From Swiss-Prot:
Its cofactor is [2Fe-2S] cluster. This is NADH dehydrogenase [ubiquinone] flavoprotein 2. Its EC number is 7.1.1.2. Keywords: 2Fe-2S, Electron transport, Iron, Iron-sulfur, Membrane, Metal-binding, Mitochondrion, Mitochondrion inner membrane, NAD, Oxidoreductase, Respiratory chain, Translocase, Transport, Ubiquinone. Core subunit of the mitochondrial membrane respiratory chain NADH dehydrogenase (Complex I) which catalyzes electron transfer from NADH through the respiratory chain, using ubiquinone as an electron acceptor. Core subunit of respiratory chain NADH dehydrogenase (Complex I) which is composed of 45 different subunits. This is a component of the flavoprotein-sulfur (FP) fragment of the enzyme. It is found in: Mitochondrion inner membrane. The gene is NDUFV2. Belongs to the complex I 24 kDa subunit family. Transmembrane segments: none annotated. One of its GO terms (cellular component) is mitochondrial inner membrane. It is an enzyme of class 7 (translocase). The keyword Chaperone does not apply. Binds 1 [2Fe-2S] cluster.
Length: 11
């Protein structure tokens, strides 16, 4: 969803 990739990298 909205910038999901960015959140995933925040791990």
């Amino acid at each position: 969803g909205a910038g999901g990739a960015l959140f995933v990298h925040r791990d």
